[in-house]
Amino acid sequence: MKILTRIPRRLLPWLLGGALALVAVSFAPALLSHETVVQIRVANSGTPLPDGFYLYQQLSAQGVRIKSITPSGDALVIHFENEEQSLAAQKVLRRLLPQGFVVAAGHQASQQNQDANRSIYS
């Protein structure tokens, strides 16, 4: 409490405001992240995953903008900037991939493996 008595009262609101601003700035990137994810998994064991570069080419040819494609264990995780791109990619992938693949959508799917993986294409 000695520190608070040494600080002039007129500076106290500015210091508290600055501290709140620092907290807000540190949490802003997490709150503003609207990245969506589509995950492609194999339905039957023994079937290899599709080639990430092939998927990138096919989605790009259909006008879908991909942020990155990342392997995640037994799945490929495709990151998109917004929900519209994700929905368009799901439609294309369901037409493009044969029956043995599962296309699942979600916000930040497979978050636990995201840091351990490297981006293949971005």
From Swiss-Prot:
Residues 32-122 are periplasmic. InterPro entries: Modulator_MzrA, SecD-TM. The keyword Cell membrane applies. It is a single-pass membrane protein. The chain crosses the membrane at residues 11-31. Keywords: Cell inner membrane, Cell membrane, Membrane, Transmembrane, Transmembrane helix. GO terms for cellular component: plasma membrane. Residues 1-10 are cytoplasmic. Pfam families: SecD-TM1 (PF13721). Its main location: membrane. It is found in: Cell inner membrane. One of its GO terms (molecular function) is protein kinase binding. Modulates the activity of the EnvZ/OmpR two-component regulatory system, probably by directly modulating EnvZ enzymatic activity and increasing stability of phosphorylated OmpR. Belongs to the MzrA family. NCBIfam families: PRK10629.1 (NF007915). Interacts with EnvZ. This is Modulator protein MzrA. The gene is mzrA.
